[in-house]
Amino acid sequence: MSQPGPKPAASPRPSRGAAARHTQEHVNEKNIGSSSKPGEKKGSDEKKAASLGSSQPSRPHVGEAATATKVTASSAATSKSPSMSTTETKAIPVNKQLEGPDQKRPREQAVKTESKKPQSSEQPVVHEKKSKGGPKEGSEPKNLPKHTSSTGSKHAHKEKALSRSNEQMVSEKPSESKTKFQDVPSAGGESVAGGGTVATALDKVVGKKKEQKPFTPASPVQSTPSKPSDKSGMDAALDDLIDTLGGHEDTNRDDPPYTGPVVLDPMYSTYLEALGIKEGTIPPEYRKLLEKNEGITQPLPDSPKPMGTDQAIDALSSDFTCSSPTGKQSEKEKSTGEIFKAQSAGVTRSSVPPKEKKRKVEEEVINDQALQALSDSLGTRQPDPPSHVSQAEQVKEAKAKEERQEKCGEDEDTVPAEYRLKPAKDKDGKPLLPEPEETSKSLSESELIGELSADFDRSTYQDKPSTPAEKKSNDTSQTPPGETVPRASMCSIRSAPPKLASLKGVVPEDAVETLAGSLGTREADPEHEKTVEDKVKEKAKEEEHEKLGEKEETVPPDYRLEEVKDKDGKPLLPKESQEQLAPLSDDFLLDALSQDFSSPANISSLEFEDAKLSAAISEVVSQTPAPSTHAAAPLPGTEQKDKELDDALDELSDSLGQRPPDPDENKPLDDKVKEKIKPEHSEKLGERDDTIPPEYRHLLDNDGKDKPEKPPTKKTEKPDQDRDPIDALSEDLDSCPSTTETSKNTAKGKSKKTSSSKASKDGEKTKDSSKKTEEVSKPKAKEDARHS
């Protein structure tokens, strides 16, 4: 612990070995602090030093001068390097005070400083090492810090080893070092000066120790292992640098307390009961409903479960009970009934259940008691008789007999009385004899098919389809044996069935008929007569969906026709946009409509007399809807729909306005075709003189005397002017029935096209015929020329 007093100023440039010395001092303090009585050791050391000093008063002054120089050198070193260890500075004044008996003041000062210090916390081993290195310090004062740092590190390692082994050895060494150190005589004046310098150095070192002590950690030094004595200078320097860093500062700082306003949570939870959980929450109106029991679903009655195939068979075959044919089966049943006996029910007990399930345990105990009571009432189980069958005995196949069981209905005895056939009797009660059976004739394929297909809702069998098969059979019979038989006849012969052999025990047909009569008449199934199409129609139902605009309600408001009203709010009557047109004839309308269609030259086009009529016709053409052709006559119900649609279309067409004139509308179709297809002229043989062969030139010299006469051309039949143009246009359309007036117009237009195409075809035919006549005439002329 440091001496109280003013703190000395810290040196600006601490040496490199200061940290090492500081750690060494800290280690020495801890090692010596463990001793039980440090004060007693210190007193004994002082007594020994005093006795040694008194026993050697007569030493030469040379030694005193050497010691003085030593002390001054050491004091100078301490002033230069104030970071020296406190152990060295403290050891020097103690030794100097003990050198001479005349120097009392330094002793008193040293005693005061030692008394103010705590119990000895330094180890005097360092003084021994320093006394040995005294002459070196005197001769070489500049190298003092390095030497002291190296020696300090060595002593630190040695002291660690000694402190671990024994503490007594550590306490004995400072006494020996003091005796060795006090052998040197000291002078009076020099000792006083040395004591003053050492005291000042001691105060400085103590003040520095007081500053550096709280920053040095104690625990890491103790935990470091012992290092080897022969350490390099670099390692020592690194150790010194590491020691200068100091310990870790405490970074755990407490957070500042919160000084803001108090935070409160005003939220709270409340439980709301749902309506109807308790009777008190039910409203009075709903209680009346609950008392009436209205709207409460009652459990459905148990619906009969669907029957399986086995159950259905058992239900149907319940009436067909058979009497036992023999008494053997009853004996077997008795024997088997004696074998089976009542067996005691096995009691199964489970492990002990947990404590929580007490109610279930009581129920299980009750069930076990009931089962035990029932099992006791049944009695004990009798042991089975031992089987004496030996293993060597084996069942032989010869002893195992096969028994045939008669089925119900095979014999007359097994048939129940209700289902037995009663023989037909006469009036007298005698049974009627059965009629002799006719020999079955061989049936053809067609007859067999007709009999088999009688049940499949078809017409009764007819004998007409059997005629070709009979003819084929006749043809095969007429063929001689040497000729080959065709394949068709062979098939007909092979397909004939063989004669049915009369089987014994077969039920006669009369019995089958009587059984069928007992069943009753079959009820007519309404679905049986329906065709397959009707069944499909029942599943797929046709639903009519209203289209947008069919009714006024479905028309959007933006597209509805708004009625024009007067100032008073009355609807205005539609004004006649144009003057009423005179009724037009059919011929006039046909000519006006067929103006754009190319027509043959036979039909003369009518000229319009007035401009008003032409304008009226153009409006009629623009306003009328496009004609639609119908292949068949429509149903009577659709005519009204068509009229309604026509009226709606007329109203829409009126709202569109007048149609702008089309410049290409009045052009004929021939011009359009000619624009696309350009005719090319090809020279034919004989058109020029150069192209005529020399063989035929002499014919030209005869001036056409030998030319054959041209056949008379057919005169084109001109229709009478009085003929109706409608009949002329509709000659080829007699087969197609006309449904409406609009279809007539389109048919007439088409007939014009067909007539024009036919006229052009007729013209081509005439050309071909003329060419053929020319070709025929040419070889005839050649033959005449050869004969001549």
Curated annotation (Swiss-Prot):
**Segments of skewed composition (Pro residues):** 1-11
Where's the Glycyl lysine isopeptide (Lys-Gly) (interchain with G-Cter in SUMO2) crosslink? 112
Compositionally biased, Basic and acidic residues: which spans? Answer: 38-49, 99-119, 246-256, 394-408, 419-430, 522-570, 661-726, 759-788
Task: Identify the keywords attached in UniProt to this record, alphabetized.
Answer: Acetylation, Isopeptide bond, Phosphoprotein, Protease inhibitor, Repeat, Thiol protease inhibitor, Ubl conjugation
> Cellular component terms, GO, for this chain's entry?
membrane
Residues where Phosphoserine occurs?
Answer: 11, 165, 219, 303, 324, 444, 446, 453, 518, 594, 605, 653, 655
As stated in the Swiss-Prot or TrEMBL entry, residues carrying the post-translational modification Phosphothreonine are 216, 479
Biased-composition ranges for Polar residues? 318-328, 369-380
For this UniProt entry, the molecular function terms from Gene Ontology, in alphabetical order, are: cysteine-type endopeptidase inhibitor activity
Expressed, tissue-wise, as follows:
Isoform 2 is the major form in all tissues examined. Isoform 1 accounts for 5-10% in tissues such as skeletal muscle, liver and brain, and 30% in myoblasts. Isoforms 4 and 5 are testis-specific. Isoform 6 is highly expressed in heart and skeletal muscle with lower levels in liver, brain and testis. Isoform 7 is expressed at high levels in liver.
Protein name (record): Calpastatin
**From what organism does this protein derive?**
Mus musculus
At the highest ranks, the source species' classification is: Eukaryota, Metazoa, Chordata, Craniata, Vertebrata
